[in-house]
Amino acid sequence: MNETTTKQPLKKRSLSSYLSNVSTRREELEKISKQETSEEEDTAGKHEQRETLSEEVSDKFPENVASFRSQTTSVHQATQNNLNAKESEDLAHKNDASSHEGEVNGDSRPDDVPETNEKISQAIRAKISSSSSSPNVRNVDIQNHQPFSRDQLRAMLKEPKRKTVDDFIEEEGLGAVEEEDLSDEVLEKNTTEPENVEKDIEYSDSDKDTDDVGSDDPTAPNSPIKLGRRKLVRGDQLDATTSSMFNNESDSELSDIDDSKNIALSSSLFRGGSSPVKETNNNLSNMNSSPAQNPKRGSVSRSNDSNKSSHIAVSKRPKQKKGIYRDSGGRTRLQIACDKGKYDVVKKMIEEGGYDINDQDNAGNTALHEAALQGHIEIVELLIENGADVNIKSIEMFGDTPLIDASANGHLDVVKYLLKNGADPTIRNAKGLTAFESVDDESEFDDEEDQKILREIKKRLSIAAKKWTNRAGIHNDKSKNGNNAHTIDQPPFDNTTKAKNEKAADSPSMASNIDEKAPEEEFYWTDVTSRAGKEKLFKASKEGHLPYVGTYVENGGKIDLRSFFESVKCGHEDITSIFLAFGFPVNQTSRDNKTSALMVAVGRGHLGTVKLLLEAGADPTKRDKKGRTALYYAKNSIMGITNSEEIQLIENAINNYLKKHSEDNNDDDDDDDNNNETYKHEKKREKTQSPILASRRSATPRIEDEEDDTRMLNLADDDFNNDRDVKESTTSDSRKRLDDNENVGTQYSLDWKKRKTNALQDEEKLKSISPLSMEPHSPKKAKSVEISKIHEETAAEREARLKEEEEYRKKRLEKKRKKEQELLQKLAEDEKKRIEEQEKQKVLEMERLEKATLEKARKMEREKEMEEISYRRAVRDLYPLGLKIINFNDKLDYKRFLPLYYFVDEKNDKFVLDLQVMILLKDIDLLSKDNQPTSEKIPVDPSHLTPLWNMLKFIFLYGGSYDDKKNNMENKRYVVNFDGVDLDTKIGYELLEYKKFVSLPMAWIKWDNVVIENHAKRKEIEGNMIQISINEFARWRNDKLNKAQQPTRKQRSLKIPRELPVKFQHRMSISSVLQQTSKEPFW
């Protein structure tokens, strides 16, 4: 078929159905392949014998090769024809046998072998036999053909490789056919034109119109193509990837197994395992390092045609609404539909409502994040039109915005639209990267179109960043530390900020955040010399892992330019300081572009790093391969971050550099004037000396300094024509002097190897010349030779020079070692301070916990007291009215509750009611179990409660009598007075208080066991005791029960003779009542 033919979209089938069909087909075809194994082994053995025979014949009998080829070719053809015939006969035999068994046995076929086994076998064998016989075996005319080589002969004798069943399935596309469709026609169609099957398959309408979108649904067929490098997943989707179930051998286009593998990369994960914006490290945390991680950002006002206000969302995980479907990652169906590119479904969901368009999943990603990540521009436009926040950030662990996701994945149209609708290109994620820095390097892509897209994205982000910062007024608002609050996405990192960050790092929230970060690299001794160690150093320099870098260089590890530039680029001042302290040259440039560290540091908002480099002696006048200086990159930042203070700092550094070297040049000029004769003599001597001495002179530091001065002054003309006025006289004099010597230095530097060879030859010639041959020479030549001999270095001079060089090296090593010791001492002091601060924090934490524990104990005690009070109040509500109003603090009003009632048992022991004694003595402990033995207590019989109520009503209903002179036995006055209350109300109160009285716990106790310390009080109480009879209570109760058992009035009325008069018919009832009342006491 034509390769340009486009494939039609395929029908989407369920994953479980597809897998079951594939596994069934695999089992069937494996059984078929086993039947052919023996035949293949026999054939392979024959082929090996043929190859061996052919090699031996070719080696021993080269003259009979032609005849041997014809014989072997005919034998091979005959063997092949016999094999094909045998296979055809076997196949026909098996078909006849199977059809015969089907007629005889009916449905006796096993369940695990489908009916299409024979058809599949027939088709496969036909395909194999046709493929094995036709293409690779040719009928060759041996007589008319040219002689064969040994390789051609071996290729002719070797039988073509037979295809296995798995290869056949993979090539012919049988894995995509349903089991019920596996007929002869379909199988034959698949073996000839496998592409035709795909044309008849389309996506079902249910996938397009339904709102029930799942995480396993396929992505829309019109999704944008990702840039062809590699596919990574976002941090929250790391665990979502799944592997193929069949080792990637049988996955067809209907399978959704690898759907999760096509998730686009996220800048957070692609840029490293940890943020260059560091929290407090475990070891070396107090050094000044990268900008803080969690800046406080305010909304920046801007003017836009859409009149939409800028907003940067807080990276807190929102409260998720209940009742809305979410997958394992916390995504709603709206987010899933945006991820899959289903525009119609998204539009329908938004129109129907019920979904928060800015709802975030477990990783803090919104629907706009999903659409921007996958590059669905139509969905992005729809979401923004309906109020999606373009600057919302994911959780603090990632901190990505939709613009960062779109930029990292190369979606140019999405980037354009987001920038047009107010997306902030200066926002940094948790890795400290902006959208510009998240874009991949062009060198990682081979396609020119992809490179063009990346360049366009960077261009637009750079322009947008400049416009954004200019609108924010960055040139007018400077911070104390030099970092502009509007330009840089972090606050100034001074000592105060550092202390706050350290304090925040010790808090539980920051501690939990640190735990979520990837662990730092561990140092091994092999890292010093291995390539893996250099990669670890590069990663640590990029991510700001100070402990690893310190340990690496302390153990003698070599610092490379790549790691140094990365630490400068990311703004890690502490790591840059360590590199410089251990002797890394601050002015070393890259090999390709001649870029210096200062050029890398400027224009990125790392003002502290720029200051550090300048203090370490960075040359601000260096130029790269394009002739640009650090000042140019500071003014024309590729990230759009221009800081006026940084520009001023570099200009001052250049001015100071020029001024310093101009003074040095003036001093050199004075020395030249004072030693003019010596200088002239040196000039004359240069014309006659040997090339070696000339090369030595050209390599002196003086010439190098003069070349640097020349280059520096040229830079001054380019960068400061309009800004600074340099002294004309000093500049012109030094420039003239340098131009005179520049050509000499250049000439010797270009021809160094040639001059060295010529010089050696000249010395050998001088040595080979005899004294006789020297005599005819002119006095001028002898004088030149004499001068050259005079200036040759003697042994003493050489020893002195070597000694000076050795002393200089020692001093330099000592100075370097001293610097390293000072740095390590500083690191140790910082570590000690950090440990002290941690101990202090621990003490404060212990005090806080102790205070919190005490406060909690007090709170629990108060709650317990309130609970006890509430309990007592609840119990008090169960007391009768008279008991409530008794004052238990007054122990002298016992007379109000007399007389005291008691009864006598068989042993003549007096028993009193404990409740009345408690009221008399105001002793609550009297009712406790420990005070009175349980064996000596007699519980109150329920039948006695009514008589006791009648006796003690004056206490529990009326609250006792008044203790005054007017109160007497005949006319008692009580606390509670029901004189003004009608009879029904009074009866109701009495009934209510009686119910409370009978619920009180009461018991009879021995009067002798009651302890009263005041004998007068005891004597007075005993004088007011009244004896009652318990037996009478029992008899009265029994009579009452008997009365209840007596026939009712109606029953008795039926027994009364009707002949009696009416006034005598009820005589018996009246007499029983009279008898009962006569037995009861009248009190």
Swiss-Prot record:
Residues 67-85, 135-149, 277-293, 481-496 have a biased composition (Polar residues). The gene is HOS4. Pfam families: Ank_2. Keywords: ANK repeat, Phosphoprotein, Repeat. ANK repeats lie at residues 329-359, 363-392, 398-427, 532-561, 593-622. Identified in the Set3C complex with HOS2, HST1, SNT1, SIF2, CPR1 and SET3. Residues 167-185, 665-675 have a biased composition (Acidic residues). Residues 24-62, 86-118, 151-166, 186-207, 721-740 have a biased composition (Basic and acidic residues). Unknown. Component of the Set3C complex, which is required to repress early/middle sporulation genes during meiosis. Residues 300-310 have a biased composition (Low complexity). The keyword Repeat applies. InterPro entries: Ankyrin_rpt (IPR002110), Ankyrin_rpt-contain_sf (IPR036770). GO terms for cellular component: nucleus; Set3 complex. It comes from Saccharomyces cerevisiae (strain ATCC 204508 / S288c). The lineage of its organism: Eukaryota, Fungi, Dikarya, Ascomycota, Saccharomycotina. Residues 314-323 have a biased composition (Basic residues). The modification Phosphothreonine is found at residues 37, 700. GO terms for biological process: cellular response to starvation; chromatin remodeling; DNA damage response; negative regulation of meiotic nuclear division. The modification Phosphoserine is found at residues 14, 16, 67, 290, 507, 698, 778. The keyword Repeat applies. This is Protein HOS4. Residues 1-233, 267-328, 472-516, 661-742, 762-790 are annotated as: Disordered.
